[in-house]
Amino acid sequence: MQLNSNGWHVDDHIVVAVSTGIDSMCLLYQLLNDYKDSYRKLTCLHVNHGVRSASIEEARFLEVYCERHHIDLHIKKLDLSHSLDRNNSIQNEARIKRYEWFDEMMNVLEADVLLTAHHLDDQLETIMYRIFNGKSTRNKLGFDELSKRKGYQIYRPLLAVSKKEIKQFQERYHIPYFEDESNKDNKYVRNDIRNRIIPAIDENNQLKASHLLKLKQWHDEQYDILQYSAKQFIQEFVKFDEQSKYLEVSRQAFNNLPNSLKMVVLDCLLSKYYELFNISAKTYEEWFKQFSSKKAQFSINLTDKWIIQIAYGKLIIMAKNNGDTYFRVQTIEKPGNYIFNKYRLEIHSNLPKCLFPLTVRTRQSGDTFKLNGRDGYKKVNRLFIDCKVQQWVRDQMPIVLDKQQRIIAVGDLYQQQTIKQWIIISKNGDE
């Protein structure tokens, strides 16, 4: 059984994820024998999921095995009781926690490469699983031999080796291992694919499950093209405000994209601020209909902390505004520089004293101001509409009233002509 050892170097500290199953034990055996000179140091990681009664015996077996072969071993016991109590599927949660621990240990060990025992049959199973459960359009279709994590790489040296070859290798060298009895239970989708569907395909002389590898190659090339196109679009059309955790994109430019590229763009943008966003394709398609509608302003709640705000020609992803964090009313007794929400107010000393105290507040229903240079009044709400001011900006913009409670300034949109040079309002941070 030949490993693909191109993923590490002779001076690397390699770490092997060992479950005690036949695949990982055969991988470990090869690393200790035929490939013992291909690395500088070898360490084992083992996760005890604490779900099966055999887990304790497996962990103890691996401790003895590693001690006999002078291998450093680290074991982690996961607590999955919360998912079990709620009858949730533990597979995804276990995988997340497992890789969180791998990340932690690779950093602690200052290791270079993590090896896993995924093999050819795992690859075919994963391809089929992603096709049938609808997760093929926004993911690669299977495993890559090499993938990158924070500070290290994951390599899969058995990815071209079939399960049949692994079994033959184990029988030849009498390699000890444990069989997970749950792998035979077809109530789990992956087991059903592995134990029933793939063998049925292989029994038909006109069909070959291995042809899925060609589909994977084609699919992954298209996936990479989409990823590149999304990055190009983001670079050209998206503006970021890192401090405020705010980004905006041209609504028209976004609407002109094909739906497949829209999904990739949003996946990239949402993951920038919140890694656990998991928006379904169906939800995305509903959003796209709203984005392309004629409605000028509306919002979509992502979580309790994040929102998508549509404002005229802009699509904005931003943190939700917590009303308690913004000024609603402020009194100014004398000239000076003041901050109101995200605006800076410069009140000049030449402003007539009879106008003080000034009241600075956010908008209220029915607000009007006197037009400059002509008779009549205009509603503040109409001014916002004419200037295409986003809804959330309207809620923060300072409106300045004089002692008589007459509006003399509306943010950076309007100042009464007679006092224009003495009240200067600008967005905080603008030059």
From Swiss-Prot:
ATP binds at S19, T20, G21, I22, D23, S24. InterPro entries: Lysidine-tRNA-synth_C, Rossmann-like_a/b/a_fold, TilS/TtcA_N, tRNA_Ile_lys_synt, tRNA_Ile_lys_synt_N. This is tRNA(Ile)-lysidine synthase. It comes from the Bacteria. The lineage of its organism: Bacteria, Bacillati, Bacillota, Bacilli, Bacillales. Its main location: cytoplasm. Ligates lysine onto the cytidine present at position 34 of the AUA codon-specific tRNA(Ile) that contains the anticodon CAU, in an ATP-dependent manner. Cytidine is converted to lysidine, thus changing the amino acid specificity of the tRNA from methionine to isoleucine. It is found in: Cytoplasm. GO terms for biological process: tRNA modification. Belongs to the tRNA(Ile)-lysidine synthase family. Its EC number is 6.3.4.19. Disulfide bonds: none annotated. The N-terminal region contains the highly conserved SGGXDS motif, predicted to be a P-loop motif involved in ATP binding. Keywords: ATP-binding, Cytoplasm, Ligase, Nucleotide-binding, tRNA processing. One of its GO terms (cellular component) is cytoplasm. GO terms for molecular function: ATP binding; tRNA(Ile)-lysidine synthase activity. The gene is tilS. Pfam families: ATP_bind_3, TilS_C. It catalyses: cytidine(34) in tRNA(Ile2) + L-lysine + ATP = lysidine(34) in tRNA(Ile2) + AMP + diphosphate + H(+).
